Amino acid sequence: MKKLSKVFSAFVKKPLTSETLESALNELNLLLIGNDVATETADALCEKIKESLKGEQIGRLTSKSKFLFEILRDIITEILTPERTIDLLEEIRIKNKSNNPYIICFLGVNGTGKTTTIAKIAYYLKKNNISSVAAASDTFRAAAIEQLSYHMQNIGIRVIKHEYKSDPASVAYDAVQHAKAKNINVVLVDTAGRQVSNKNLMREMQKIVRVSEPDLILFVGDSLAGNDALNQAKEFNNSVGIDAHILTKFDADAKGGAALSISYETKKPILFVGIGQGYDDLEPFDNAIFISNILDLKEE
């Protein structure tokens, strides 16, 4: 996120006047887009800055950097604020009061680290004394069941699985029934990585959702994929519906634009970010920390 921080820092320290604001915002817009901020998000951010400065005599401000910093902080806070906030642990506890498991369905394209992320979530739940079972509903990709089983065995979580090419929805259904019978708190449903253009796999995904009736649908995206991650999230949201995001490889993302764009354009919260390969390398996404990282500005 250092690159995005430098972009905002340079903007704040510019010798802005009412006459030069437009060109400065155009330059900011291009720099944002160059750092994985989607065009629509960059346009909205710059327009909000312009609106916030309307009527201000910028050149006469005695503390211009501080003033612009506060404007940016408020605007980015607004961009990152979702339509619905999710307290995962609390939602699980509420659902469990009715003696029913809380069901989480994970989706995304291949190569984003989805299966490893499921293991990280299982480990996170285990640390919070919440039991879980995994459904190996990726019956499409070779070695997918073995990969999930390997990770879950490492952390002591059972996997419900069928044969390859079997109905993925039936695997999810069996996992839910197992959780009910064994009084397990959470069902974690793995699904085949798919492109939204693959209509057969998308119909399969819709069936999994219809049969398992998840309480939470999580899109797992690669933060290094930039606008591709945003486009994938939007397409999955249109086809299936998603409730929140997990961004992987967040520790390696020098730009930080994907988080801004996904938050703004889907209006869905980022619940967690992956920060390494270990099962414990998962952190709840904190808006305030993210903002402080990309607005690491010091007044001149």
Residues of each region from the PLM?
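Short, cationic motifs built from Arg/Lys/His that form the positively charged side of catalytic pockets
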Residues: 141, 154, 191-194, 210, ...
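Primarily NTPase-proximal linker/entry elements flanking Walker-type ATP/GTP-binding cores
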Residues: 4-137, 144-164, 173-179, 186-189
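Charged, low-complexity surface patches
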Residues: 21, 114, 140-141, 168, ...
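Short hydrophobic/aromatic patches at helix-to-coil boundaries
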Residues: 190, 299-300
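Short hydrophobic/aromatic residue motifs in ordered secondary structure
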Residues: 39-41, 141, 251, 279
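Short acidic DE-rich linear segments
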Residues: 1-6, 300
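Short glycine-/small-residue-rich Rossmann-like dinucleotide-binding loops
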Residues: 110, 192-193, 222
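Conserved catalytic-core segment of NTP-binding enzymes
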Residues: 147, 167-182, 196-299
